[in-house]
Amino acid sequence: CIYPMYDFAHPIGDALEGISHSLCSLEYEIHRPLYDWVVEHSQSMLPARPRQIEFARLNMTRTVMSKRKLRALVMGGYVKGWDDPRMPTLSGLRRRGCTAAAIRDFVSRIGLSKADSTVDTALLDACIRDDLGEKAARVMAVLHPLKVVLTNWDADKTLTLTVENHPKHPEMGSHTVTFGRELYIEQEDFMEVPAKKFQRMYPGFEVRLNGAYIVKCEGCKKDENGNVTEVYCTVDMDSLSGSEGADRKIKGKTLHWVSAADAVPFEARLYDPLLADDSALEDETEPTAEDAVDAEETEEAEEADANLSRADYDFLKKLNQHSLTVVRGVIEPYAKECAPGTALQFLRTGYFCKDPDSTAELPVFNRTVGLRDAFAKAAK
């Protein structure tokens, strides 16, 4: 009896399951004549006549695609499971915030080929941006907060501002934010002594606070180590967005902010590619029979360390040690109420997805993709 030898079981199983096209990687090309032979000689007994098509495996820059290497990452504790947002698994991509539409767009763009090639992850990022750019509501979140005090604003005065969820899609509605005497901005948006062409906040310079007023920086306060802890500004009361005075032209940029009065602490998980460079991708072939036996042994051991000494796993030395950075910031209350899996654009920062690890006290957001490909820029 030859059943269930793979070359016999594969076409019969496909036919019984109603498969029309069996898509395989290139190493199965030499098996196709036998696949076709079995289908041809079993046609009278099978409900369908499947066809095998081969294509080159998908390789992506700075991304581990080999199943055995991905398993080593999981079993060795280098990632937090198969759904870790750094993993190229469907569950990992979903948790990262990648949408099904973005994946379909990516697959459509790269197509099928029999030529070995490596696709830049920037293409997948672009597909994600294109999709989320149309779907994600805009919110303000500050990852590295710096307090701003508006010295000519009454301490007990607050203003409720209405902001659109999406500038191009009014049908997505709006939400409110609170404006008051104390706010938070990003630390990088202030410089006591500005660099050349710096057009954000510094003493004597005006900027606009998104959806609110034009403010002028008057000075700052430092701690004993010389670190800026507070920035002092005055408000142009006639410059509220939507009013006549809002048309006044200034040289400064528009900054995002979060009111200190109702700021919600949150955790941001900033993900970057798992590999520091592409040199670890030189051998992404599937395992031999001997490798498969080793994989079974690791399953029994419940950890990968027993096999990580093999030359196969030298790629672990080339992991990006900064593939995950966790920061604590503040975000507007609207984002706290979103359900896990909700995609948002943090203004001027990137696209984020609310993680299932979120609690009532501490929302957690995973960075899906930045507004630009910062990793590729830094690698040049």
Residue ranges: model-predicted function:
Residues 79-80, 90, 95-105, 110-380:
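Basic, alpha-helical terminal appendages of large translation-related enzymes
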Residues 1-112, 153, 354:
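Alpha-helical recognition segments enriched in aromatics with Gly/Pro capping
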